[in-house]
Amino acid sequence: MTVATAYKRHSIRGVRLRGSIHFRGSGKKCITQLFGEQMMVANATGCSSIYGGSAFVHRFAIESSTGAFFSPYCRNYRSGRGPAWANSLFEDNAEFGLGMATATRQMRESLKRKAEELVNVTAFDWMCEATQKWLDTFDDTLANRKATDEFVAALEKAILPIDGAIEFWQGKGKEAYGAEVAAQKLQEAKEAKAAGSPICPCHGCELESYLLANKEHLAKRSQWIFGGDGWGYDIGFGGLDHVLASGEDVNVVVVDTEVYSNTGRQSSKATPAGAVAKFATSGKKIRKKDLGMIAKSHGYVYVAQVAMGASQAQYFNVIKEAEAYHGPSLIICYAPCINHGIKIGMGRTQNEEKLAVECGYWHLWHFNPAEEDAGKNGFHLDSKEPDWSKFRDFIMGEVRYNSLMKTFPQEAEELFVATERNAKLRYEGYKKLSEM
């Protein structure tokens, strides 16, 4: 037993002790530590793809036992498995990820029908047991990985070579099934060998051979769609809403920097009132769009708003709940950005997230439809009552706000009051939902 295996793999301590199969210092690292060996990622063009895996450096390098990393995404050196990552165009990433999920689901459902048929025809109890275990964990990402490995091992063991089939029907098969049946099966085996078949021609072996030939599609995939607020709130919003409305089992992460970061600091619908950005040099006049509440209105979408620096435990639990939920999920992550002009420096972004939540600028919450279906209140406000006295100090600690005071001081004061009022209205709305 090693230190890493002393704790449950998917506990907070267990994850911290495991090697990552993604670059370090990111919320995505935590996701890869939990589900990396089964992850498929559709990544929108933007900051999330630039620092998340540029095409010309992306390669399946092996993670070394010493923790050395050679590319943003790597394979686990023990299992040889790792995330499958692809970068789409900016505007169609949600649909791109949906296509991945749909294709995977249809392939697995086809294999599921074959496995259900195999349960009824296999002559081996251990084959039946392994097949049934795979079927029972079909929709469980974590449990199905182990069940798949056992299923594949059983398939490899169960397939009878053609010479073995001939030998069986000449001897033990005759005793077990009778001379008449054995003679018929022996003739079929000889004909199959003459035709060049390497395996027993029985229906069970045919099913096992087909399943084994498609073994890479057996395990439950963890489908993720990554993008920024320019994609999720603006240009790709129509596609994102379509994907959420599809009911497909996908997980969407929106990295919310509240501005078009990669394209040059332009204002987006995620930009709050009072913030200075291109196309809003005198401060944005209208409030930030509440993407989370829009997604929640579907009623069957798991939605969460997180800030890892404010609560690692909430972020960790949200990631696990989102993956476990059988349906679409949306996780909106507050992400301090160089375009914010943070006075304390980009080396302290985790602390900036903590301050944002403490003062009420950002709120932590999650909505789980599964709890609502069970007759409970599925909405949970995860952050404490904000200290509103810190709100003005927080925004003045960022150049995107304090620069407005220098250029348009009168308008700045009015907009800053509106910014705080909007934050309070959001909080009161979330609080009411959590108390229902």
Predicted stretch roles:
Residues 18-19, 228-233:
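Short, glycine-rich nucleotide/cofactor-binding loops
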Residues 192-212, 217-225, 234-251, 255-385:
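Glycine-rich ThDP/TPP pyrophosphate-binding loop and its adjacent helix/strand module
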